[in-house]
Amino acid sequence: IGLISSRLLLEGPIKKETTSFLFGGRSSYAHLFLPLIESVDNNKAYFYDLNTKLSHRVNEKNTIFLSGYFGRDVFDIDNLFDLSYGNSVANFRWNHLFSNKLFSNLSMIYSDYDYTLDFGLAEFDWNLGITNFNLKYDLKYYLNEKLKIEYGLNSIYYKFDPGLIQPTTDNSTIQNQKLEDKFAVESAFYSSLDY
């Protein structure tokens, strides 16, 4: 527990030697004291984030992991300018042991980043974001204690949302405008040799 922020971490077994969890969080609370200062009565500044992880050992050769991250930052100056952004990530990973020298990881990852600007003086706000889906398959092969080969496939689908601009009052001169979404796919094969 700190003066302007605190963090919490909990971890432990759900089922002994099979399933475990981790939960962590962090948050600031300085904004709760800002109203005590007369000149900054309408200002805000805070953040929070949460981390979660669940692991389950299916058998001697297979373990699955599910994890997530959620975070947000907010900065508001007397309702004149408001900035808020956050990210959400979910990750599923399957670890498979082929032998004591070869193992693989199959991962599916979802990420969503959003950003909001509210221009109080200009009476409009702007919301934008980036979403991506990532599928990757990695293998590691230990030839001996000194030599390791890594190889795999990776593909990412992107959705870029340049934003929605909209008036916040009836008096605003800004017109509603939805900017066109953009899409992209990035795929790769990689290999490396570590000695």
Predicted features, each with a name:
Residues 37-41, 80-81, 122-125:
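Short glycine-enriched, charge-decorated loop/helix-capping segments at active-site entrances
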Residues 24, 80, 165-166:
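Short amphipathic alpha-helical leader/targeting segments
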Residues 1-42, 46-57, 65-69:
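Predominantly transmembrane beta-strands of Gram-negative outer membrane beta-barrel pores used
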Residues 55-72, 84-195:
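Face-selective signature of the C-terminal outer-membrane beta-barrel domain
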